[in-house]
Every structure is written in C-alpha cells, then in structure tokens.
UniProtKB/Swiss-Prot annotation:
PANTHER family, A to Z: TRNA(ILE)-LYSIDINE SYNTHASE-RELATED
Keyword list, A-Z: ATP-binding, Cytoplasm, Ligase, Nucleotide-binding, tRNA processing
Organism: Exiguobacterium sibiricum (strain DSM 17290 / CCUG 55495 / CIP 109462 / JCM 13490 / 255-15)
Entry binding sites for ATP: S17, G18, G19, C20, D21, S22
GO molecular function: ATP binding; tRNA(Ile)-lysidine synthase activity
Protein name, UniProt field: tRNA(Ile)-lysidine synthase
Subcellular location: Cytoplasm
Family: Belongs to the tRNA(Ile)-lysidine synthase family.
SUPFAM superfamilies: Adenine nucleotide alpha hydrolases-like, PheT/TilS domain
Length: 414
C-alpha cells in the first residue's frame, strides 16, 4: 500500500529506536527525499540495545543521513517508563535547540492511538481524545504522520520493502498496562466488534477537532478579557463548565493536564472562595480580589541581593526598580537616619513609621491589593538601625514634627 505522509518542507528530526515502526518511518521519509536527521536514544537497560544502536547508526551512515545519539546512565537505578520518557524527550529538545530543526517526527501508529484512548478512558481523564497528530514541543512541533495506519500495515510495508528492524522482546510481555491492552483487550474488541479500530479512531479525531475549535475560541476570549490586573473571575464564570476547563489550557498552552489538574482549577474558581492558588510545574495560577493571574514562580535565589547605600546617595537598581536617593529640604530628616542604608526585600515583622504610630509593611501591601506571591519581591529601604524608611512603590516613612525642624532631609524617589 502507499502511505500518505504530510509534513512541512523543512529540515526534520526523526526519532528512530530501531524497531519496525520507526525504521519504516525513516525509510518512508528518506524515499520521499526529506531533509532528515536521525535522533536515537540508547536507554542502557537491555543488552540488545547496543546492537539496535549500531544498526540505526549504520542505516544513517549508509545513506549519508545525519545522526545524533546518546546513552542514558542510571547509576544502578531501575528507572520507570515515565523517567525514560522524560529523559528521552529532553534529549530530543536539546538536539532541536542545537541543530535549529523545529520539527520532530515520531512513529506512533493507529494501534498506539487505540491503546492511548482506552488508557485515558479507564483512568478517567477529562479529555479522551488520544494522541494529537501535531502538537507544540520545545521550539517547534511534534508530528505523527503514521497515526492513520495500523501496526500490521507497517509490518507489511517493512517486509515488502525489505526494511530491517529489531524487535524489542519486552513488547511481548504484559508487565505494563499498555502491553496488557495490546495483547489482551484489543484482540478481544476486534473479535467482538470487527472494524471497531477505524470507527474508534475516527470518533477520537472528531472529538479532538471539536476540542481544538473550543480551545481556539476560549484562547481568543481570554485574550480579549485579560486586563492589567489579570483575567476577571466574572468573565470566566460566564463560560460553560467545559469551556472553563479550557481556560487553564489557554493560560498554559504547553502543559499536559490530568482530570485532577482541571478539578483543582475549577475549585479555585468557586465563588465561595475569596482567594487561593494552584501550582502546575513552576507556574502559579492565583485568584486574588476577583482576578485570576498566571505567573512563573520566582526561585528564591533569583531575588536580588541586598544593596548598601552610602552617605553619597545616588541612583540604584534593585531588580526592575530604579531608586534615587538625594539631599533636599523636605522628606526624611537626616538626623533621624543612621547610615548606611540597605535596599532589600520585605521581611516578616517589618513596620514603617506613619503620621500616627507604625504599620506592618505586610498590611500595607494587603491594603494595596498586592498578590501574596508578589509581596516578597517588593523592595524596602531600611537604615542601619533597622528602621523602614520606604516601601518602594507604596509608602515613605513620616517623621512628623522632626521634618518641620530639619535643615536637611533625605528624599527617596522611584
């Protein structure tokens, strides 16, 4: 049979394990004169992997096709399938960045699609729509052009064209859920409902296309409703529940989400909750004062180091803030200040002097509706005695009658 392969006319990175599926994919793309580079990962778990890696290298070199290979080291550990996948895709991403090839091509086929759909179903995942044919990845996209074709069709092609491959013996076992699906459930379904494969894959494709259209609408809606303070909760609540789930996808388009992830997001949106936050990887989605914001979590060691300000004063840069210190006739009396001054982040217990008494800096930031997660990033100016002289962007300390009697004062501007 003839395979219809639709891929960009750009340089491709093709993942090849040495098995039938990926060797057929490489053969098809080579015969179609695509600009290929092979990428191979030796997982370091089976003795046969040495032979497979050498066979992939020989295939590429015989055709003068570029190849990048790596061998994973586990230091005596027995890695899970998820750990192998994470490191495998990390290598793909690394090669894409180094070579500038934006299109990664994988050899998933129709049988893989059926297994994935059933696994999603029995796990109760929110989106039972299988493996996407194209999706964003790293600096480009992942393509799976063999999804319409069955494993048997790939075997038939390999035999007819004398494509050499290596069989991974672990695929014949039933240790993993996917293998149990492959060897026990799929044959039973084929017996009970001949032709179910095409109907199931087609239904999943329709579901996926509908979901993409819905996501396109929600993404556009989110962009239209977004304000400087974030996405208004009221705007999200106007959407149907299924569309509210997709707001999460619109905010974090490069993440994969489970049903539990979506449920945590929907719980965050509940009207009876005044505020809250949920985390997805190194991203934080926060609900504060009627708005939903999505920000990358700052690492503690990324907060700026404290800066010392001497008696000569001048202009200083703390993070993204520019702070100028000068001598004037109004402001904080020099007689009330002990040098050197320090610019640093807010600390628990910080208080600032006002016209009547003092006030916690944390309360000032709450009153100013600064999100909890952003408060540590607000700089304060303190003197050598620990007095808070300014909360940058919000308040200057007030020294009352001392200011009226002072001949020389400190001005802090931002």
């Amino acid at each position: 049979m003839e395979f219809e392969i639709h891929l960009p006319k750009e340089p491709l990175l093709v993942a090849v394990s040495g098995g039938c599926d990926s060797m057929v994919l490489a053969h098809l793309l080579y015969e179609a004169n695509h600009d290929l580079m092979i990428v191979h990962v030796h997982h370091g778990l089976r003795k046969e992997s040495d032979e497979e890696a050498e066979a992939v290298r020989a295939w590429a070199e015989a055709r003068r096709v570029g190849i990048r290979m790596t061998r994973l080291e586990w230091e005596g550990q027995a890695p899970s399938q998820a750990a192998c996948r994470t490191r495998r895709y990390a290598f793909f991403q690394e090669v894409m960045a180094e070579t500038g090839r934006r299109h990664l091509v994988l050899a998933h086929h129709r049988d893989d699609q059926l297994e994935t759909l059933l696994i999603q179903l029995i796990r109760g995942e929110a989106g039972v729509d299988g493996i996407p044919r194209i999706r964003s990845f790293a600096t480009g996209q992942i393509h799976r052009p063999l999804l319409p074709y069955s494993k048997q069709q790939l075997y038939d092609y390999a035999k007819a064209r004398q494509v050499v491959w290596h069989e991974d013996e672990t695929n014949a076992g039933t240790k993993y859920l996917r293998n149990q699906m492959r060897h026990r459930l799929l044959p039973l379904l084929a017996e009970l409902r001949p032709g179910y494969e095409e109907a199931t894959v087609q239904a999943a494709m329709v579901r996926y296309e509908q979901k993409q259209e819905h996501l396109k609408y929600v993404t556009s809606y989110v962009k239209e409703q977004m304000t400087d303070r974030g996405l208004p909760l009221e705007a999200i609540q106007k959407l149907p529940t299924d569309f509210r789930r997709l707001v999460l996808r619109a905010l974090l388009p490069d993440h994969d989400f489970t049903s539990e992830d979506y449920n945590r997001f929907l719980t965050l949106l509940r009207v009876d909750m005044p505020s809250g936050e949920v985390y997805y990887g190194n991203w934080r989605i926060q609900r504060t004062y009627g708005y939903v914001t999505c920000v990358r979590c700052p690492e503690k060691n990324l907060l700026p180091e404290a800066l010392e300000v001497g008696i000569d004063l001048g202009t200083y840069h703390y993070g993204e803030q520019t702070i100028t210190f000068s001598r004037t006739t109004t402001g904080i009396p020099f007689s009330a200040v002990q040098f050197p001054l320090t610019i640093r982040s807010v600390l628990p217990g910080d208080r600032i002097r006002l016209a009547v008494g003092t006030k916690k800096v944390s309360r000032i930031l709450v009153d100013a509706k600064v999100p909890r997660a952003s408060r540590a990033e607000i700089p304060v100016v303190v003197d050598a005695a620990g007095q808070v002289l300014a909360v940058i962007g919000h308040r200057i300390a007030i020294f009352g009658s001392f200011e009226l009697l002072a001949e020389s004062c400190l001005m802090i501007e931002w």
